[in-house]
Amino acid sequence: MRSHLARNATTTTPNVYRRLHAAVGHHHGLLRPCSATALSARRCLFDCQHDVAHIPRDVALCTRTSKRTFISLFTPKPERFVKLPHFDPGYNVLLQYRKSEVEQERPPPRDQLVTAFKKLTKFKADTNRPLNPNQAFLLRTVLHYLLVTKPEADAPVDLKMSDLENAMDAALLPPKGSPEFHLALARLLHEEIMRRRLILLNPEERKVHLTKDDFARYIKALTQYGGSLEAAGRVKEFWQQLKDERSAVYFRGSGRIWIMVLEGLANEGREEELLQFWEEAQETGGIKYIPGVHQIFVTYYARQDKIEETKQWYSKPIHSGFSPTGETLLELVRSSRRSSQKWNEWLLPVFEQVVQDKFAKKGSLDAFLQWSVLALDKGPDGIKTYLQTMASGDFYQSHEVKVDATTINRLMQAAQEKGNPYMAERFWQLAQDFNIKANVHTYLNQMSYRLDANDIEGAHQIFSKLASGAVEVEFDEDLPVMNKYLRVLCAQQEPNIQHILTITSALEQRHAVLEPETIVALCLVFLNHDKKFDVIDTLSLHSVSISHIERQQIYKAFVDYICSPQTTTDRAWDAYSLLRQYFPETSVDDRVRLMESFFERKKPDMACLVFGHMRAHDDDNMHPTADIYVRCLEGLGRCPIPEQRPSDPASSLKMVHNMLKMDTRVEMNTRLYNALMLAYAAGGDPFTALDFWEEHITRSAEGPSYNSLAIVFWCCELIPLGDRYARPVWQKMLRMDLEVPQLGLTYNALPDPVSKDEFAAWAKEEYPEEWARLESKGQKETEFQGPVFNITRLFEA
């Protein structure tokens, strides 16, 4: 093994992790070797096993400018350390396995993989944090490897049934991104669980086995992740199997399986299959029209704003005389917000019936209160009467009916939906009249509506209470509001950077992963305030913990920032350096856009570096095509580098030309030679440009194009006695009856005032109207060529 490959195989770095994440998303796991610019012999940024203060040349543009006073010369500032990323337990081992698999190296030891699998799935299940798509993909890949490779004969069973069940619990936590890999993981887990259970059971025990929750969990995965049609077929097959084995009587809780499929079909918008499966559920499974089923059908039609169907399913008698659930009524309230008039006319008697029911449930009454705020425009004074009735206990018989923090929270949410933060604050004051103690959701609602009102100080007061432990926060339920808080702070005209860093530090201690929109907001505000190390910290901490879709969202924002005319060139280049370091999966189209943005900034040297990084990328799919070579050379033709001569071996043009010579995937054609002529002529070397014309274009089977002719005449303008080169070409054009260039371009190309006067006299006589229009554009004087018309001359390859 070559030395640098051996070192990379034994040294796991965050840079490798970022590339692994990029590979899992962009290539569905087809990891490419690291580029020499992103991970080289100089070592990558933030080496976990070495001093993190050693930053490579790749990010030298991100270092701070040294500023010292006289006294500080003797008391140097402490060195700034880059924050290392936090990995979920076991995740780094899974990444190492994927790297070894793609690069065909020896994988980590089996016991390490088993331990990593157990740690990650147990951590996710215990903390209620969903797997992101990358983690689900890697878990599925490692599990497949562990199942197809056998452990040593004397080794204990490495993955126990409880480990597989933990993994299934983790897979069932709904992710933010695509659930494709979660479903694949759940399938493999279910197959292995079923295999292990059946292989250990005799026929009599198998009947008891069928009462287990394995099948229900698998159906939940299917219905949750878009496989409801398959789930419907599985349920019918499973039920028939139970009947054939006379085991249906042992299977308790079968109703929830049928209901899960109904809910999945409704969520996927499959109306025909939903109605058909409902008929089968009644006939085969004996499912009744219970409140849960009532909620599924009413919610399905209400979300589609089909009021007649909603009325029909709502009015159907519920089994055993039960009342609709509170969630059903809440969905009707949401529908009334979309088209209030026709819904409220129907909902008025519906909620009157709810309020007058002595046995009404608390959820139904809370829904009524929300509807009163949203539809009837009731304020705190009007709601107070209802709350007093609920709190008295004289009318409603259910012991659950009481005024608590949940009631106030829903009223505050209704006020927020109306865009009235002042009303939401009054509802909180109303809660104090009833001696209601705030819970975590109360504080989060307060923080949210204060942010909506741009009350930064008020939101900070709530943040301080949460940070001091006024209430216990479980399962990161405060993260959505904290992300919103950070985004609002970043959007201020003069952001308080220190305040932002205080919040991010508090979240970092919890190892919380921010939303991609928040990461973008933080990075941009830090870039705009030249806080480059804070950008590095933000990307280092979060870029390895998010899915490839979220990574794409972040790098797209970086590309937009770099290409924005409002961004200074220095900041744009700093942002590009970080983009290249942390997001090697940046698409070719975006890289071309970056290259052209630097050409537009009149920074061709930077544009050529972007092109060079594309050419040096280890992923062949990222290499420039012939069209991209042309666009780069055209850019050099528009804005050459004044201090560089094309013949200089270190020039940007020479670098691009050498890359083209060495690129075996690109076949030379007239368009490429045209682009080379443009670049060399613009760079001050028209003779080399004419060599391409004489030695390649005129002798090729493809021959010159109209653009070739325009470019070669321009080259002739740039050299002494250029008419000697131009006349033979011109004569050939006349013989072939080709289209003659416009009058203005021809006039401007003539080398001296005498020739221009002769041409003008001829043009006035032959084309009087065209010449008059040309004269209306005006002229300007040049030092050697005399007057020229004010027309823009653009060349394309």
Swiss-Prot record:
Locations listed in the record: Mitochondrion
One biological process term in Gene Ontology: mitochondrial gene expression
Molecular function, one GO term: mRNA binding
Keywords annotated in UniProt: Chaperone, Mitochondrion, Transit peptide
Glycoprotein keyword on record: no
Transit peptide, from-to: 1-69
Chief localisation class: mitochondrion
InterPro entries: TPR-like_helical_dom_sf (IPR011990)
Transmembrane regions listed in the UniProt entry: none
GO cellular component terms attached to this protein's record: mitochondrion
Function: Chaperone protein involved in the assembly of the mitochondrial NADH:ubiquinone oxidoreductase complex (complex I).
Protein name from the UniProt record: Complex I intermediate-associated protein 84, mitochondrial
Naturally occurring in which organism (per UniProt): Neurospora crassa (strain ATCC 24698 / 74-OR23-1A / CBS 708.71 / DSM 1257 / FGSC 987)
Gene designation per UniProt: cia84
